[in-house]
Amino acid sequence: MSHASPAAKPSNSKNPRVFFDVDIGGERVGRIVLELFADIVPKTAENFRALCTGEKGTGSTTGKPLHFKGCPFHRIIKKFMIQGGDFSNQNGTGGESIYGEKFEDENFHYKHDREGLLSMANAGPNTNGSQFFITTVPTPHLDGKHVVFGQVIKGLGVARTLENVEVNGEKPAKLCVIAECGELKEGDDWGIFPKDGSGDSHPDFPEDADIDLKDVDKILLISEDLKNIGNTFFKSQNWEMAIKKYAKVLRYVDSSKAVIEKADRSRLQPIALSCVLNIGACKLKMSNWQGAIDSCLEALEMDPSNTKALYRKAQGWQGLKEYDQALADLKKAQEIAPGDKAIQAELLKVKQMIKAQKDKEKAVYAKMFA
């Protein structure tokens, strides 16, 4: 008979803990820390632990190192799970256990009754190898068929980020890889806090912070702190790091909005809007014109009459040489703030660009029919 998955994290302080450092598209996203249920499924837990450390050498079946390092998450299905562990073929057809190609289903003690559970992928009964999946929702149809052998105790936000990557079918469009992995011993740093020298003392994902997400005052304090760090990076023209900090603010704000009353959400809106606009400004500096436009559209969803969003969106259109679109946005901005000199100057500049473009076209046609 299957049991409900453990509520405590960890469920047993003596169980081993392992970690994955995850990269998406060559960029570090964060760390997932997992507890392995060695007290319930010792053989399955030991297989996974050893594959995290790489201590067992080379596989007898694959001829490849028995190690998850460099192994991709090859299959992602939103509102279901993320799957990895094929270290040999990297596409779901390979891998092997530390005991040989396959080993038996140890037991089905725990149910797949929530997100963040670690379970063995298989090709039928008693075909466990190295492939695994992490649930992102309850998956009761897998009970009695797949062995639940661990849980995410930190880094659920990283798993959710993986869940939401763009896919072609079930294959991630960007390479999602376990860049580093290993075992965490008693007293080891779990690596949840940033080490970028910025003074940021907050976990990258709010799920890992020991805070009450319903405490709006606390969320605002953290958000202001992170925004200020982002502003420091902006001033030093480190656009990518600035974007990371502004995006982190939005994660904290969105997580809080999901659990608070509607009346309190408006208190978080100004800082969220400011950070979305700042992300747009960074993207303009990076010549990521479409990205800047997308950020400004997000800001305009929050505040349809925001002139800063319209102005920056117009700059994005100019980067794409879509001057008529830029003109339309600047005219809207001028209607809202008729006395704004920056908008007036930008409007004049765009009109001159449109005229120059038309003059150039006329000259081309004149040559053609001369």
UniProtKB/Swiss-Prot annotation:
- Respond yes or no to whether keyword Calcium is given for this record: no
Q: What class of enzyme is it?
A: isomerase
- Which Gene3D superfamilies does this one have? Cyclophilin-like (2.40.100.10), Tetratricopeptide repeat domain (1.25.40.10)
Q: How is its activity regulated?
A: Less sensitive to inhibition by cyclosporin A than is CYP-18.
Q: Which residues form the PPIase cyclophilin-type domain?
A: 19-183
Which residues does this entry mark as bearing Phosphoserine?
5, 198
Q: What is its EC number?
A: 5.2.1.8
Pfam families associated with the record: Pro_isomerase
Catalyzed reactions:
[protein]-peptidylproline (omega=180) = [protein]-peptidylproline (omega=0)
Region (Chaperone activity) residue spans: 185-215
In this chain, the stretch annotated as Interaction with HSP90AB1 covers 214-370
Spans of repeat TPR: 223-256, 273-306, 307-340
Which molecular function GO terms apply here?
A: FK506 binding; Hsp70 protein binding; Hsp90 protein binding; nuclear estrogen receptor binding; peptidyl-prolyl cis-trans isomerase activity; transcription factor binding
Keyword vocabulary terms for this entry: Acetylation, Apoptosis, Chaperone, Cytoplasm, Isomerase, Nucleus, Phosphoprotein, Protein transport, Repeat, Rotamase, TPR repeat, Transport
Per the record, residues carrying N6-acetyllysine are 171
SUBUNIT field = Identified in ESR1 or NR3C1/GCR steroid receptor-chaperone complexes. Found in HSP90 chaperone complexes with kinase clients LCK or EIF2AK1. Two monomers associate with one HSP90 homodimer. Interacts with HSP90AA1. Interacts with HSP90AB1; PPID and FKBP4 compete for binding to HSP90AB1 and the interaction is mutually exclusive with the PPID:HSPA8 interaction. Interacts with HSPA8; PPID and STIP1 but not FKBP4 compete for binding to HSPA8 and the interaction is mutually exclusive with the PPID:HSP90AB1 interaction.
Which family would the database say this protein is a member of? Answer: Belongs to the cyclophilin-type PPIase family. PPIase D subfamily.
What's this protein's name? Peptidyl-prolyl cis-trans isomerase D
Record the organism.
Mus musculus
Organism classification, top ranks?
Eukaryota, Metazoa, Chordata, Craniata, Vertebrata
Protein's gene: Ppid
